[in-house]
Structures are given as C-alpha cells and as structure tokens.
C-alpha cells in the first residue's frame, strides 16, 4: 500500500498535467486500486489510533483524482437512465453485499463506500469514501456524505444528514462514533465529531461554527460532542443581548450503564 500511496500523492501534485483522455495507465490503475480498497473496507479515509482520529489524506486525493479522470457514463436503471462518473456499489450479481447487509429498494450506495456486516439501509444515500460499521441502521431519507465515518451500532434516524468533507485534504471527515443515536432531521456536518454513546435529539444542527453549550459545566465548545452526551436544540443570548443564537445544548452526560437502563425518550425528557 506504500507504493500505491506514493503514486497517488505524486499524481495529485501533477494533476493539471493530464486529463481523462491522457491519464497515464500507472496512475489510472493506482486510482482504481485505491477506490477498491475503500470499497471493501481495507482502507479508510480516517482511522482511530491510540485514541486519536487520523486522516489518510492520500485516500482523499485518490477520490478527487477519480472524479477528475473518469469519463461521464450512462447508467441504465431499468426505468430510467443516469449520467455520472462514479458507478453504484452493487451494479451486478458479482458485487454482493457483506454478510447480513440489507439494502432496501431505493437505497443508493456509491462505489468506494464500505458497508460492514449486519448494516441495514432503508431508502437512503451513502456517498463515496464513507465507512459504515457493523450493526448500524441508516433510516429512511438519511444521508451519509463523502468520507463520513459511522461507527458500530449507530442509529441514523429518518432524514438525518451526516455531512461530507473531501476538501481541504487535511480536514477530518464528519465522524459518528460507536453506539450513537442521531435524531430525525438532525444535521452533523463540516467535520464535527460525535463521540461514543451520545444521543442527539431530533432537529439538532451542528457545524464547526455552532456553539455547543454544556449545561453542567457552562462551557461553550465547537466541533466536538463529548462521549455520552445528551444533546437538544436550543439557543444562547448574543453578547450584546439583542438576539438569541442557535446552539446545541448538552443537557447531561451519561455512562454506558445508565444508557443501557434508560430509554432514549427518558434521557431526552429529563433534559
């Protein structure tokens, strides 16, 4: 994989020197090999090592090169046609899902996204570079953006959106860690991290500029929901006191033992 990384990095530095028609065979093969590694889960855009998430920038480079070098193609969906550069993940009988993966009709998964065993997709959308770990449910009309990392046993409720982050290369993708619940119509975007075991209420919107207020500590932070947080939508007064600004409110933090004994509705109502 080291050789592949070197080829991709060098190609990205010289990306203006070739087009779809003139891309060297060596680079073309390296791009496709990288996409295959992402597709089967052998490579991830981001990985947690020693408690820290690290981004594989070269894998992002490969995706951007994939967009640049692939020609537009016609995809026959039976009842209509689509025109795109990136094929879908399950395009024929030889590309079968992992054990226990359920893909309900009208769910769409792009090539280069990985679905671990025992994941369930209701009609939803998973973009290239995304990683969805085992036991996770992606509910109806939920979307998982490019390069987003979704942990084990996560529930993305109906209409929830997890934003994609391809550029800048050094930016972390949006990350939802293990055992999280993301409420209906909530949006977690711009590389925000929701740590393990957190519960996000319905209709919570969190980007990098969204204030995250911890009711217990009275701290305001940005870009990260701490482990075990129970979060609801709210607002904070502006500095001049003339208006209120939308905020995400951490009403409490619970451990795994409490989470296992108390229903999600109870946790949110107690807030």
UniProtKB/Swiss-Prot annotation:
Substrate binds at residues 102, 139. GO terms for molecular function: 2,3,4,5-tetrahydropyridine-2,6-dicarboxylate N-succinyltransferase activity. One of its GO terms (cellular component) is cytoplasm. The keyword Cytoplasm applies. HAMAP family: DapD. Homotrimer. This is 2,3,4,5-tetrahydropyridine-2,6-dicarboxylate N-succinyltransferase. The gene is dapD.
């Amino acid at each position: 994989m080291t050789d592949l990384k070197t080829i991709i990095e060098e190609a990205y530095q010289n990306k203006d020197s070739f087009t779809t028609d003139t891309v060297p065979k060596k680079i073309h093969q390296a791009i496709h090999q990288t996409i295959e590694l992402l597709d089967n889960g052998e490579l991830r855009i981001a990985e947690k090592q020693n408690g820290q998430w690290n981004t594989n920038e070269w894998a992002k480079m490969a995706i951007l090169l994939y967009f640049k070098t692939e020609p537009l193609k016609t995809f026959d969906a039976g009842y209509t046609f689509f025109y795109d550069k990136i094929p879908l993940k399950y395009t024929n009988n030889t590309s079968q899902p992992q054990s226990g993966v359920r893909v309900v009709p009208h769910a769409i998964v792009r090539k280069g996204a990985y679905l671990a065993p025992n994941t369930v997709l209701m009609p939803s959308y998973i973009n290239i570079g995304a990683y969805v770990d085992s036991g996770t449910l992606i509910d109806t009309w939920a979307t998982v953006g490019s390069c987003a990392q979704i942990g084990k046993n996560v529930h993305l409720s109906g209409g929830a959106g997890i934003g994609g982050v391809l550029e800048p290369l050094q930016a972390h993708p949006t990350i939802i860690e293990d055992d999280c619940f993301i409420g209906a119509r909530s949006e977690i975007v711009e590389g925000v991290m929701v740590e393990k075991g957190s519960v996000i209420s319905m209709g919570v919107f969190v980007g990098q500029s969204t204030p995250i207020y911890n009711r217990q500590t009275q701290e305001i932070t940005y870009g990260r929901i701490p482990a075990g947080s129970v979060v609801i939508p709210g607002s904070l007064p502006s500095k001049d006191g003339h208006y209120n600004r939308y905020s995400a409110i951490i009403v409490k933090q619970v451990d795994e033992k409490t989470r296992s004994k108390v229903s999600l509705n109870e946790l949110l109502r107690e807030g």
